[in-house]
Amino acid sequence: MQPQYQMGYDRAITVFSPDGRLYQVEYAREAVKRGTTAVGIKAHDGVVLIVDKRVSSKLLESSSIEKIFKIDEHIGVASSGLVGDARALVDRARIECQINRVSYDERIEVEALAKKLCDHMQTLTQYGGIRPYGTALLIAGVSDGESRLFETDPSGTLLEYKATGIGIGRPAAMKVFEEEYTADLALKDAILLGLKALHSATEGKFDVDTVEMGIVESSTAQFKKMTKEEVASYVGQFKQ
């Protein structure tokens, strides 16, 4: 049963409760909190995204689970929450990148893309007949030689981080980052720190088949998803 004071205020996205809350947005955030853990770490020479794919059955092909997406040559995202909603946002992000190239003949800035996505997500908290996206994104990229890492949430809030996590394991991952992150990390060390955070978030329940990684190096400004062999190499180093 819902509390009496809450009934009626969570029926429509456009209605605030007396204490200033939008319950549908809060419920969308809960969908993110139930999602798999994704972490992002900014190093002095790039950015890394690492995701726990949570293979729920031995019959499931782990390669069919995709939580990290290449958006443009220099930008990638990791998602947590409803996978279908994440795909819709990824498609929109790719279109925004193409529009920018056609209009200005140049790559879109990482921050500009993040703001466009958050503006779109925010509009879905204002109108009836629709619902907020039940997903959050970590947006990693390089602009003008500088590494950037942004986090979105269903309300359209945009925050930039040095290191962060989303999903069910966020508290454990953030504890690791707050204790061990330093701004002078090299990309390889950032990957190992990200694996440590993911290890803590999943209570050690990960291996090469359940981990997905993507990196963008400042020197090349090229985002790439790591191969299974590259992931296995870093997981092996971490477990030594």
Curated annotation (Swiss-Prot):
- Asked whether the keyword Electron transport is assigned, the reply is no
Activity regulation summary: The formation of the proteasomal ATPase PAN-20S proteasome complex, via the docking of the C-termini of PAN into the intersubunit pockets in the alpha-rings, triggers opening of the gate for substrate entry. Interconversion between the open-gate and close-gate conformations leads to a dynamic regulation of the 20S proteasome proteolysis activity.
The primary site where this protein sits is cytoplasm
SUPFAM superfamilies for this protein: N-terminal nucleophile aminohydrolases (Ntn hydrolases)
A Gene Ontology cellular component where this protein is annotated is: proteasome core complex, alpha-subunit complex
Q: Report the superkingdom from the record.
A: Archaea
GO biological process terms on file? proteasomal protein catabolic process; ubiquitin-dependent protein catabolic process
Q: Which GO terms describe its molecular function?
A: threonine-type endopeptidase activity
Where is it located?
Cytoplasm
What UniProt keywords are attached to this protein's entry?
Cytoplasm, Proteasome
Cross-referenced CDD domains: proteasome_alpha_archeal
Q: What Gene3D superfamilies would the database entry show?
A: Glutamine Phosphoribosylpyrophosphate, subunit 1, domain 1 (3.60.20.10)
Function comment: Component of the proteasome core, a large protease complex with broad specificity involved in protein degradation.
Q: How does it assemble?
A: The 20S proteasome core is composed of 14 alpha and 14 beta subunits that assemble into four stacked heptameric rings, resulting in a barrel-shaped structure. The two inner rings, each composed of seven catalytic beta subunits, are sandwiched by two outer rings, each composed of seven alpha subunits. The catalytic chamber with the active sites is on the inside of the barrel. Has a gated structure, the ends of the cylinder being occluded by the N-termini of the alpha-subunits. Is capped at one or both ends by the proteasome regulatory ATPase, PAN.
User: Which protein family is it in?
Assistant: Belongs to the peptidase T1A family.
- PANTHER family this protein is in? PROTEASOME SUBUNIT ALPHA/BETA
Return the HAMAP family for the record: Proteasome_A_A (MF_00289_A)
Any idea what this protein is called?
Proteasome subunit alpha
By which gene is this protein encoded?
Answer: psmA
